[in-house]
Regions:
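Short S/T/G/P-rich N-terminal loop/turn motif that feeds into the first structured element of a domain
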Residues: 1-86, 135-148
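Short, well-ordered beta-strand segments in beta-rich or mixed alpha/beta enzyme
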Residues: 48-52, 83-112
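Short amphipathic alpha-helices and their capping/turn residues within compact interaction modules
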Residues: 75, 79, 88, 111-114, ...
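Alpha-helical oligomerization segments
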Residues: 97, 104, 108-148
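Short, flexible coil/linker segments at or flanking structured domains
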Residues: 35-38, 68-71, 88, 94, ...
């Protein structure tokens, strides 16, 4: 991918935003405006969605500390196009995601020390959580979300 195409893709990814206030309970395709990607050139992108229900007594300072360290490490590792940090709704439901250039880059970041540290505190922070993984591909200007 040329520098110009990569810069366009990165800028387009920054424009991905929630389409609805209840995005955490919707499919990732419906909850967000992905239209900026339809104007970009790419083969496929790798999306990791983290859906969670926070414990009522969660220590937000601890959660944010671990989240921020994992984000910094992921950013430094390369390939992270967009990190969306969701806010929990009144029921504690939250959706965050990382959009990557490649699956390999996502796996590398997940194996980094700060990310492993964040996963170790998951049981203390969440009543439940699930990871969803997708390939995002283009068919003309249409985006295809293929859950894997």
């Amino acid at each position: 991918m040329t520098v110009e195409l990569r810069a366009d893709l990165y800028k387009a990814c920054l424009r991905i935003s929630p389409r609805h206030a209840d995005y955490a309970t919707l499919s990732v395709e419906d909850g967000f405006d992905w239209s900026s990607l339809s104007r970009c050139s790419f083969g496929s992108l790798y999306l990791v969605v983290f859906r969670s229900v926070r414990r009522p007594e969660v220590d937000l300072d601890v959660l944010l500390y671990h989240d921020d360290r994992a984000y910094e490490e992921a950013l430094a590792s390369g390939g992270l196009l967009r990190y969306f940090k969701g806010q929990a709704n009144e029921r504690g439901e939250c959706l965050s995601f990382c959009l990557w250039e490649t699956r390999e880059q996502a796996i590398q970041a997940a194996d980094a020390a700060s990310h492993r540290s964040a996963t170790r505190i998951s049981a203390q922070m969440y009543l439940s959580y699930v990871l969803e993984r997708y390939w995002i591909q283009k068919l003309g200007e249409k985006l295809i979300f293929d859950r894997i």
